[in-house]
Each structure stands twice: as structure tokens, then as C-alpha cells.
Amino acid sequence: MDELIIAGKSFKSRLILGTSRYPNPQVMMEALEASGTEMVTVAIRRMDLKSDSAENIMKFLDDKKYFLLPNTAGCYTAKEAVLTAELAREALGTNWIKLEVLGDDETLFPDIPELLKAAETLLEKDFVVLPYTNDDPITCKKLSDMGCAAVMPLGAPIGSGMGIRNPYNLQIIREQIDIPLIVDAGVGTASDVAVAFELGVDGVLLNTAVAQAKHPVQMATAIKHAALAGRMAVNAGRIPKKLYATASSPTDDMIEIDG
């Protein structure tokens, strides 16, 4: 599979995995390995960076093997998100940030005015910003024009497992922006990953679909193959959809059969 390039950095895998809600750290590590991912996202506000306890997933993640992408999960204002990003940069030594600014704790949809405000501030502070946003082409174009390194529209609400609910918006976004387009949230199973790539997205970020699967490692393996299949399919070029049938066998020089 061709490489995913974000802000000049190359990744052989086009999958990004989250690190929360796994049964235990061992299952998490096995699932990450099975998925083939090279980038994992960690929620800065939900971990004790100074702790050496078993609950601190940072002690299990090899930063030489995985590119750590901190996120601002749990932030509801631009101010909270900016402060969290600065904490992540200080603690992890990275200026990359997956920017999340939520509107409420029920839908977990992004608060777009606060998101745009936070993105602008972080870009001024020399962060590499990857914003979680809704599947609105206008918002994604604004984020792209501001200088974000990628846009990450939701496929469906976070953790819903509903899959790609609005493929047409994703196609419009794909046509309107030149930076990487990464589906973030809503993926439920391997077929959702394949569909996303067939729509032309550059990457897929998922967490719950793997972490909460009955067999997380097996699901991680499935999404790895789904990503490969979806990306290969879109590069291969599918046939156009048509209302009427077209015979797959040629009709020229057919043997005449007397009735």
C-alpha cells in the first residue's frame, strides 16, 4: 500500500488507532501489532503522565515503534484545548496534536466555532494540527485553508459503530481539499474501513471498533486487510454504476441457434 504523508512525515500504514477502552494493556499491544498501525493517539487529559502504574498506558507504548499523536479529548472550549496541547508538547516532546473541542457530552459532536478558534491559536504556536470535525465540506475547507495538516471528519458519532453515514459529504470534501482526509469516529467493523477508503479518504482513525470488539486482536487483523483492500480498490478504479445491465460476455460472432 502506498504511504500516507502528513506534514512531510511518511507512514506505511494508513490506519491510526486509539489506545483506550481495551480489556487490558496486553490486549491493546497485541491489537496495535496486528493492525500494522504506526501511529497511535493518546488522551492527554485522561492519563497521569508521571505515574508508573499499570493503568498508565505510556509505559507500554514504544515511541520508537509508534508515532504518538496526543489528543485533546475531554475539552469543551478552545482555551482548554490549547492548554492541553501545550501540556502534551511539554510532556511528550511533540508539536503534533489531534485537536478535539466537543460541543456536549451526549453527542460528542465538535463545537465548530471553538474548534476553529483553537486551530488558529495552535497554528500560530507552531503546532501540527489534525482537527476532529464534522463531515461539513465548508468547515473542512476552512480548516484546510488555515493551514491544518489534515482534516478528520467523523464518519458517525464517536463510539456509535454506525459506519459511514454520509458518504456524499466525504466525497465532496475529498474534491475540495488537497491535504490528507482521515475519517475519525463511527467505524464499527472492517467493512466500514474498506468503504471509507473506497470513497477516497487517505486514512482512518478508529478505537472502539477494535477495543470493544469481542476479539480485539482478530478485529485489528481484519481492519488491516480491509484498509489494504479499500485502498487497492480505489486505486484500481471501479466501474461506473448504471441503471441497466450490460452483458459481461461479448455478443459479436455468436453461434446462431435455429429455433
Swiss-Prot record:
PANTHER family: THIAZOLE SYNTHASE (PTHR34266:SF2). It holds the Pfam family ThiG. Keywords: Cytoplasm, Schiff base, Thiamine biosynthesis, Transferase. GO terms for biological process: thiamine diphosphate biosynthetic process. Belongs to the ThiG family. InterPro entries: Aldolase_TIM, Thiazole_synthase_ThiG, ThiG. Its main location: cytoplasm. The keyword Cytoplasm applies. Pathway: Cofactor biosynthesis; thiamine diphosphate biosynthesis. GO terms for molecular function: thiazole synthase activity. This is Thiazole synthase. Homotetramer. Forms heterodimers with either ThiH or ThiS. Its EC number is 2.8.1.10. It comes from Chloroherpeton thalassium (strain ATCC 35110 / GB-78). The active site is at K98 (schiff-base intermediate with dxp). The keyword Coiled coil does not apply.
